[in-house]
Structure formats: C-alpha cells, structure tokens
Amino acid sequence: MARVTVQDAVEKIGNRFDLVLVAARRARQMQVGGKDPLVPEENDKTTVIALREIEEGLINNQILDVRERQEQQELEAAELQAVTAIAEGRR
C-alpha cells in the first residue's frame, strides 16, 4: 500500500478542508462514475489514488468543474440528437 503525504496535496489545493472535498469528489467519480484514474492504481483505494492525482497536479477543483461541465454538455447534445431523431421519425 502506498503512503501518501497529505501535506504535499494540501499545498496543491490550499487547505485541508478543500483537499477533503476535492479528494472525495474525485474518489466518488472513480467509484461510482466509472472514471479511470490518471495515475497507476498500484492496488490502492480510490481515496489514495485521488490524493496522488492531486499531489501530482493532475486534479484540482477547477479541473473537476470543467470535466463535469463538458460531460454534461455531451450528455445534453446526445439527448437532443435522440429527441430530434424521434421527432423526425414522426413526420
């Protein structure tokens, strides 16, 4: 099991409280959302992987916001295409 020094991750995010929020959000993405880790898993839990990603500067709150916004836009575009196809099929 890898040991993560939280201090390095805190320095990347700013404070411990925001670090907890960002790491939990990213870990949840990997567990529930099926998102792939950006660092080698090395048999670590998602929380440790999230902390390693933060420590390496691959993840922060702004990056998570941008990714979620892009995914939401892609989902909405796909839904719009499906609705358009249904509407055109009824004509």
Curated annotation (Swiss-Prot):
Q: Which GO terms describe its cellular component?
A: DNA-directed RNA polymerase complex
What's the protein called, per UniProt? DNA-directed RNA polymerase subunit omega
Q: Which residues form a coiled coil?
A: none
Subunit notes for this chain?
A: The RNAP catalytic core consists of 2 alpha, 1 beta, 1 beta' and 1 omega subunit. When a sigma factor is associated with the core the holoenzyme is formed, which can initiate transcription.
Q: Which UniProt keywords apply?
A: DNA-directed RNA polymerase, Nucleotidyltransferase, Transcription, Transferase
**What NCBIfam families does this protein map onto?**
rpoZ (TIGR00690)
Q: What does this protein do?
A: Promotes RNA polymerase assembly. Latches the N- and C-terminal regions of the beta' subunit thereby facilitating its interaction with the beta and alpha subunits.
Q: What class of enzyme is it?
A: transferase
Under InterPro entries, the record lists:
DNA-dir_RNA_pol_omega, Pol_omega/Rpo6/RPB6, RPB6/omega-like_sf
EC number(s) on record? 2.7.7.6
> What is the native source organism of this protein?
Shigella flexneri
Question: What gene is this protein a product of?
Answer: rpoZ
Q: Which GO terms describe its molecular function?
A: DNA binding; DNA-directed RNA polymerase activity
